[in-house]
């Protein structure tokens, strides 16, 4: 089953209604959300896009396109700023070019928004080389050749930098589904809300997902022709008319929300102005006498007198009711807000620059992203840019450094912060650190477990190989007792550990004995693994529980048992991270333009190395050793290049900024990543988010910005804690980031208003931002 709607707010409302009616745990697997987020999951889960890909928001798209245009203008853009609608136009053209090049049906082609040259934007467009003038200077129009050239550069740049905009989520999902017939028809039941707001491309994606070949398959669309508010995004009434021809129509006539006096007014407007057939207009269930003063059209002489009248009208409202002042534009919303402030009328304004687009919030969201995946360069670039008080480098320039120049030298963006550029005796990167460790003693290890929950699941197999200067000197394989059920399937394949575990049942050791043997085998050597954070943390977590249990049995008075209370896996190297540092070398050796993924099995396959990823720890360790040796051979010539490059003053400034502001918090929060927190406490993710934001005033010139949003920050914290994050099912920071980060990155201010955390009773909003909200 698949439940799709248009906005995060609508999806949350739909999920709440489902949870109220159904308590079955299988509902947790039901996808409820908007189509863009669904397509994002589809692309990442199926390795259609690189796991390091980053989704751009509107501001990022504007910055990228403006930066690309500036690079191609002799002498720069003369201090001009690219109009936002020009960036939108170029992005739309790039989507259209992608569709034309990839065989999309013409009816799904992306709609290019209307955009013309006028007196307000002429100078800016001219500065960016986007208009052409005839010989007499009288005929000025868009230079469509220049527009398309910019659109193509934008497409190429996104590919090179592993960037996606919101159009890409739909375009790449459609292209993959079209090229992969076996992936289509996954769902026997699909319901789509607000269908009038979906574009032909979105509807075609839904059709590809629906399995209409089985009995009782259902695809139901909910919508209203009169609510096509997002027509500027490509939604068309023609789409609804096409559905009328292929689907059975059910009209819902009973309106349970609006009182009859209000609905009658809307129906009159629909009939007389929109020329709707009265037969299809809804009937009100509520018969309510029109309150005094309701449904009035009031003429005022001046804009100022209108504002004063609004203030007077609000004095007579009921204090417990929510009141919305809906205006056409952000400018008018600002004027109303200023008038209310002058009259001490408490209110919440949804307009202008969304709070989640403010510098401080963008920095905080980038911090959460690098905390979850520290090998992705785009959030690091965002973090460096947002924290730099003097903005010496543009966001695009920083992104180019981290996504292009760093990989050429085997550097990770995280190296900027985790390693110092000032001490010649210390390593400057993860790769150099690994190279030094490789010359000594390393332990390559892997675990197999009963599941992925570090706090609850248990280790059932440990395999390890000890290397000295790259040569194998010792091996270890252990099978540990467990009372937990071993899963029968790993995703869509049978779990090989079921048979393996039974075959070695006679060799089982207790978890306590197994961990003692393994940790004594490791000693104080660094450990290596593919996605080693998971393996190291489940060992540390389970062993910590065993040590605590043993202490309670021994009694606090007993001294520490050296055999038990010895060590934990602290210093570790991750071949998953190293594979990102060496990706250019891997691609060159494999003759590929893009890796299928950074999974162990794919890396072994494309490089033709010995070993196989069978999901049995001993096999996986041997494969990791093969990979490790290949990495060592590739890394040696890169280390000197790294040192020269990292001495660049621009790179040093970026490193110093991160190490001064972020490093202490990052190390603290990373140590909390897998620690289970009490469900009654504020979500650990919210604590981390708050700590990061509260640390910023000491390091940024944007104190005015912080004051502007200070009122709304507590609402954001409360929203994340009470509405978004479920600490019962997500007890660790890692689980909370894994489950909620995508939604946090897509939050908008109106999302706060659709919950009960906003105590203000008066709201100011533009028409478009109020869609989906309800007021008394």
Short names for language-model regions:
Residues 29, 48-143, 161, 255, ...:
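ATP-hydrolysis module of ASCE/P-loop NTPase motor domains
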Residues 33-39, 190-194, 222, 329, ...:
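Conserved helicase core region in the C-terminal RecA-like lobe
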Residues 376-443, 451, 466, 649-765:
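Accessory C-terminal helicase-associated subdomains
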Residues 317-428, 599-609, 618-619, 623-676:
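ATPase/helicase motor core of nucleic-acid motors
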Residues 1-51, 181, 325, 770:
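P-loop NTPase Walker
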Residues 2, 10, 31, 59-65, ...:
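Conserved helicase NTPase motor core
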Residues 440-443, 450-556, 591-597, 601-606, ...:
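Conserved non-catalytic scaffold segment of RNase H-like nuclease domains
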Residues 247-248, 255-345:
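Helicase P-loop NTPase motor core
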């Amino acid at each position: 089953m698949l439940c799709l709607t248009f906005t995060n707010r609508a999806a949350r409302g739909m999920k709440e209604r489902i949870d109220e009616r159904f308590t079955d745990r299988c509902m947790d697997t039901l996808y409820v959300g908007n189509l863009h987020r669904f397509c994002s999951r589809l692309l990442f889960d199926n390795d259609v896009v690189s796991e390091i890909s980053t989704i751009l928001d509107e501001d990022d798209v504007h910055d990228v396109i403006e930066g690309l245009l500036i690079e191609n203008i002799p002498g720069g853009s003369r201090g001009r700023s690219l109009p936002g609608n020009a960036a939108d136009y170029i992005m739309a053209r790039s989507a259209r070019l992608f569709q034309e090049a990839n065989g999309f049906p013409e009816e799904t082609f992306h709609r290019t928004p209307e955009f013309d040259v006028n007196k307000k934007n002429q100078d800016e467009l001219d500065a960016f080389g986007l208009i052409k003038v005839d010989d007499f200077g009288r005929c000025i129009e868009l230079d469509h050749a220049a527009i398309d050239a910019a659109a193509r550069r934008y497409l190429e740049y996104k590919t090179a930098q592993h960037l996606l905009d919101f159009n890409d989520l739909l375009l790449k999902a459609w292209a993959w589904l079209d090229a992969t017939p076996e992936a289509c028809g996954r769902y026997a039941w699909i319901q789509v809300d607000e269908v009038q707001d979906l574009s032909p491309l979105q509807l075609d994606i839904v059709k590809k997902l629906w399995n209409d070949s089985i009995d009782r398959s259902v695809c139901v669309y909910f919508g209203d022709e009169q609510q096509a508010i997002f027509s500027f995004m490509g939604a068309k009434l023609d789409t609804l008319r096409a559905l009328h021809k292929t689907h059975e129509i059910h009209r819902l006539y009973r309106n349970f929300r609006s009182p009859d006096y209000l609905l009658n007014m809307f129906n009159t407007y629909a009939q007389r102005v929109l020329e709707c057939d009265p037969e299809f207009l809804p009937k009100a269930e509520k018969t309510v006498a029109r309150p005094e003063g309701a449904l009035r059209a009031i003429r005022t002489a001046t804009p100022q007198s209108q504002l004063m009248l609004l203030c007077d009208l609000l004095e007579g409202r009921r204090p417990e009711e929510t009141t919305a002042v809906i205006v056409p534009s952000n400018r008018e919303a600002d004027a109303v807000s200023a008038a209310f402030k002058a009259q001490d009328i408490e209110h919440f304004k949804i307009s202008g620059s969304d709070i989640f687009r403010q510098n401080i919030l963008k920095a905080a969201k980038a911090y959460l992203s690098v905390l979850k995946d520290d090998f992705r360069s785009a959030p690091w670039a965002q973090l460096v840019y947002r924290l730099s008080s003097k903005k010496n480098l543009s966001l695009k320039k920083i992104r180019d450094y981290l996504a292009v120049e760093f990989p050429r030298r085997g550097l990770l963006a995280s190296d900027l912060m985790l390693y110092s550029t000032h001490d010649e005796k210390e390593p400057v990167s993860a790769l150099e650190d690994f190279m030094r460790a490789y010359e000594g003693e390393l332990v390559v290890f892997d675990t197999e477990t009963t599941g992925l929950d570090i706090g609850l699941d248990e280790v059932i197999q440990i395999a390890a190989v000890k290397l000295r200067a790259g040569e194998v000197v010792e091996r270890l394989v252990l099978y540990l007792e467990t009372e937990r059920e071993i899963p029968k399937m790993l995703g869509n394949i049978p779990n090989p550990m079921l048979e393996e575990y039974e075959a070695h049942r006679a060799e089982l050791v207790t978890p306590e004995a197994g961990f003692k043997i393994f940790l004594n085998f490791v000693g104080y050597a660094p450990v290596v693994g593919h996605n080693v954070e998971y393996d190291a943390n489940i060992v540390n977590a389970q062993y910590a529980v065993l040590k605590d249990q043993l202490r309670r049995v021994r009694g606090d008075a007993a001294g520490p048992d050296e055999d038990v209370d010895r060590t934990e896996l602290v210093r570790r190297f991750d071949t998953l991270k190293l594979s990102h540092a060496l990706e250019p070398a891997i691609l060159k050796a494999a003759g590929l333009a893009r890796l299928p993924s950074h999974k162990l099995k794919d890396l072994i396959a494309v490089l033709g190395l010995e070993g196989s990823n069978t999901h049995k720890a001993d096999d996986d360790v041997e494969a990791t050793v093969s990979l490790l040796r290949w990495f060592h051979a590739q890394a040696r010539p890169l280390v000197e290049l790294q040192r020269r490059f990292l001495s660049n003053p621009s790179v040093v400034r970026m490193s110093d900024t991160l190490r001064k502001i972020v490093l202490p918090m990052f190390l603290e929060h990373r140590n909390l990543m897998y620690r289970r927190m009490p469900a009654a406490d504020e979500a650990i993710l919210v604590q981390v988010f708050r700590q990061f934001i509260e640390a910023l005033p000491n390091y940024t010139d944007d104190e005015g910005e912080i004051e502007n949003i200070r009122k709304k920050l507590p609402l954001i914290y409360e929203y994340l804690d009470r509405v978004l994050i479920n600490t019962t099912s997500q007890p660790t920071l890692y689980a909370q980031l894994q489950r909620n980060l995508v939604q946090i990155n897509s939050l908008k201010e109106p999302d706060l208003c659709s919950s009960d955390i906003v105590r203000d009773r008066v709201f100011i909003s533009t028409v478009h931002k109020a869609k989906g909200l309800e007021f008394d």
